[in-house]
Amino acid sequence: MTKVALLGTGIMGAPMARNLAKAGFETTVWNRSVERAQPLADCCTVTKTAAEAVTGADAVFTMVENSGAVLDVMFGSHGAVAANPSALWIDTSSIQPSVARDFGAKIERFLDSPVSGGEKGAIEATLAIMTGGSEEDFAAAKQWF
């Protein structure tokens, strides 16, 4: 079974995680305020740290507030990338293009994949995903899209 982690279980991230679990992927979640992730305990593993969530994951999705939050989760105080640098990192947050390019240069496998469709699209698993990155990584990620 493919293991995925999703970091950021707010309005968009929580239903995205639930849909990944429903699709049969072993899903681990983390949120900066852990109580926001607890409602997903019925279908996902909830962890207390981002590093714990990403350990052993084949793919890591980030869905957080902005470029600064993604930077902090991935490289800053939460150190998620260091815990699993070989995973396919898929950022679905809306971040600045220059930041996405910087992440792409720092991470072995990275897809910049902002989404459109709002909470309704996340709940119904109908989000439009606009992805930039290598063709190989995109092909690997299609199973989760």
Where are each of the predicted segments found?
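Alpha-helix C-terminal capping segments
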Residues: 37-42, 80, 103-107, 145
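CheY-like receiver
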Residues: 52-56, 73, 144
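Rossmann-fold dinucleotide-binding core
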Residues: 64, 94-145
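Short, conserved loop/helix-junction motifs that constitute active-site signature segments
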Residues: 77-85
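A short helix->loop->beta-strand "cap" motif at the edges of active sites that frequently abuts
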Residues: 84-87, 108
